[in-house]
Amino acid sequence: MERVTLALLLLAGLTALEANDPFANKDDPFYYDWKNLQLSGLICGGLLAIAGIAAVLSGKCKCKSSQKQHSPVPEKAIPLITPGSATTC
């Protein structure tokens, strides 16, 4: 078990070291500018959050309720657990 754990940790560590290559080729099609990607993601998320809060606070998005109020529990509820239905295993 210890050998498997050590092998998995070594495998994860080697891939992490390879991913943080400081001499990466910027012309490579798989090279990403992570700082700009993170910044644009945060800006997009912030704008969506502000738009969502504005939509909720504007009052234009209201639930249409019918005239008849529905109760969450039916009038004649069927009990799911009846006496004698429980077993001891």
From Swiss-Prot:
Database matches in CDD domains: FXYD4
Task: Extract the PROSITE patterns matched here.
Answer: FXYD (PS01310)
Its localization reads: Cell membrane; Basolateral cell membrane
Q: Which Pfam families match?
A: ATP1G1_PLM_MAT8 (PF02038)
List residues traversing the bilayer: 39-59
Give the Extracellular compartment stretches of this protein: 21-38
Q: Which InterPro entries match?
A: FXYD4, FXYD_motif, Ion-transport_regulator_FXYD
Q: State if RNA-binding is listed as a keyword.
A: no
The chain's Cytoplasmic topological domains, given as residue ranges, are: 60-89
Sorted keywords for this record are: Cell membrane, Ion transport, Membrane, Potassium, Potassium transport, Signal, Sodium, Sodium transport, Sodium/potassium transport, Transmembrane, Transmembrane helix, Transport
User: Where does the signal sequence lie?
Assistant: 1-20
A GO CC annotation recorded here is: basolateral plasma membrane
Subunit note:
Regulatory subunit of the sodium/potassium-transporting ATPase which is composed of a catalytic alpha subunit, a non-catalytic beta subunit and a regulatory subunit. The regulatory subunit, a member of the FXYD protein family, modulates the enzymatic activity in a tissue- and isoform-specific way by changing affinities of the Na+/K+-ATPase toward Na(+), K(+) or ATP.
Please explain the role this protein plays, according to its UniProt record.
Answer: Associates with and regulates the activity of the sodium/potassium-transporting ATPase (NKA) which catalyzes the hydrolysis of ATP coupled with the exchange of Na(+) and K(+) ions across the plasma membrane. Increases the apparent affinity of the transporter for Na(+) and increases NKA activity.
The entry assigns this protein to a family as follows: Belongs to the FXYD family.
This protein is called FXYD domain-containing ion transport regulator 4
Q: Which organism is it from?
A: Homo sapiens
